[in-house]
Amino acid sequence: AFNVGSMFRDPDNALLPNWKHIPVGYHGRSSSIVASGEPIFRPKGQQKLNDQENPIFGPTKLLDFELEMGFITFDGKSLGEHITTDEADHYIFGMCLFNDWSARDIQKWEYVPLGPFLAKNFASSMSCWIVPLDALEPFRTNGPIQAPKILPYLEYKGDKHIDINLSVSIETPNGEEKTVCNSNYKHM
C-alpha cells in the first residue's frame, strides 16, 4: 500500500488517514478470475501523462500484480447479517494463492474520487489448489500489533494469522526463473 500510495501521491502522504482503520478491499469480477498460468491480456484504458493536459486511451504500460491469498467460503449468513471476527473461521473452507493484476497508469487516473475500476477488474490469477483451513491449524500464529487500536467490530482473539512463506517468481525472456518478491502471510 505504501509503494502504490507513493506512486500516486508522494512518500510523505502515501497512506491516506483511513488506511490503518478500514480493511481495504476491491470488488472485482468473478468472470475475470483465471487459473494460475493462464495468459493475462494487457488492458486498455484512459491514462494521464504528466506532460499532457488531457488523458489518452491505450494499453497499460505499467502492468503490475499483488501477491494475495484467496479465501474460499461456505454459505454465509442472510443478506445484511454480520459475521463477527470470532465466527469468521466457521465460514472459511480454505485458502489459495491469488494474484491481483493491476494497470497502475490507468489506476492512477481513475482512482480519484471513487477508487480503481477498470485498472483492477480485468484479471486475477487463482491457484488451482485450495488448502483446507483445518490443514493450516499447526501454522497459526499471532499477527502484528495493530496501531492505532482498531474499532471493536474488527478486534479478534487468538491466533488468527497463519505462518505461510510466500514468494513470486517470473520467467525471464531467456528462460531463467527470477524471484521478485518474498513475504509471509502472517504479516498481511
Roles of regions detected by a PLM:
Residues 183-188:
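Extended C-terminal subregions enriched in glycine
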Residues 1-181:
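Active-site microenvironments in enzyme catalytic cores
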